[in-house]
Amino acid sequence: MAYGLPRRNTVQNILKGSCYKIQEPWDLAELTKTWYSNLTNINLPFLGEIAFGSPMNLLAGQTKQDCPLPSMQTMALEKEYEAKRLAKLKSKENACKEMQVSLREKSVGLRRPLQPK
């Protein structure tokens, strides 16, 4: 069946806060069909071409050839910014790894019992 256990559980988690209860895969299919029917009955202009199982007709677009390329200064600034961003990410990763290693090396003993009242 198309809606196996992992997908059904995922959809159940998504719909957990709503009023819908999904018990079986066909309930999910029925709910999807109902939602789709409601969307097509709204008659919004951008939903006019959507029908059950039919492809949408796309209009051919024109590309502009006169788009200017970015300048050398812009490219250098972008490269510098990206290098700084990657360096920050790398330093964060290294700090996390160091912290994990230090926590692993730390000897952990049992907690002392509380004093009786």
Swiss-Prot record:
It holds the Pfam family DUF4522. InterPro entries: DUF4522. This is Uncharacterized protein C4orf36 homolog. PANTHER family: C4ORF36 ISOFORM 11, CHROMOSOME 4 OPEN READING FRAME 36. It comes from the Eukaryota.
